[in-house]
């Protein structure tokens, strides 16, 4: 988790300096309990400095609600939110639906298409770190040369 504006700015500057490719950002902003983890200024810096240089961001529903300023209750809301985030930030959005939408269906929104990845919810109290694991796997697949949709699917 990147928790301060200064750290977010430094990371964005270094990624740009080194011309990093295949940047995958899991914008950790909300704890599993629902508590906000970032101050408002850090969220603003994240939205202005780091997320726009990402290839894809992987927010969960509470994080997407913060990024787009709308409530998400349905799959149609997920599409509208992902579109709003894409249009605001200019990067692909993998909106993870495991929080409060039917089952655990994820939505990939890109310039070219909208893709659904259907999943079944597994009730397990030990889910801490699953979003970070997913974003790391996507980054690894992109680094191997797979396109974004295949990287998410794998």
Predicted feature residues:
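Alpha-helix C-cap/termination motif
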Residues: 17-18, 87-88, 144
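Glycine/small-residue-rich loop that forms an oxyanion/phosphate-binding "nest" at active or ligand-binding sites
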Residues: 1-52
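General structural feature for long, well-ordered alpha-helical segments within catalytic domains
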Residues: 3-11, 42, 46, 74-81, ...
